[in-house]
């Protein structure tokens, strides 16, 4: 409330980089959604490139109308 689940190809991020990413996303949500810091949760799910089609099929394509930033690619 809000919860953000970032899915991306695998990256070698340090714990410090993950913390910074979460802090930046949290800051944006606080600013734009008037959320409290304690209400925000952020997940980072790394998906192998050969498994991305499943993400597209289950999460991106069916929700295209709800996406506030659409991808510049299709599958």
From Swiss-Prot:
It is found in: Cytoplasm. It comes from Klebsiella pneumoniae (strain 342). The keyword Transmembrane helix does not apply. Keywords: Cytoplasm, Isomerase. GO terms for molecular function: intramolecular oxidoreductase activity, interconverting keto- and enol-groups. Homodimer. It comes from the Bacteria. GO terms for cellular component: cytoplasm. The active site is at 2 (proton acceptor). This is Tautomerase PptA. Belongs to the 4-oxalocrotonate tautomerase family. PptA subfamily. Its EC number is 5.3.2.-. The keyword Transport does not apply. It holds the Pfam family Tautomerase.
């Amino acid at each position: 409330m809000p919860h953000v689940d970032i899915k991306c190809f695998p990256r070698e991020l340090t714990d410090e980089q993950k913390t910074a990413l979460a802090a930046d996303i949290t800051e944006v949500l606080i600013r734009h959604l008037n959320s409290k810091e304690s209400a925000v949760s952020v997940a980072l799910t790394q998906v192998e490139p050969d498994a991305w089609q499943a993400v597209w099929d289950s999460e991106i394509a069916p929700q295209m109308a709800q996406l506030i930033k659409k991808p510049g690619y299709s599958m």
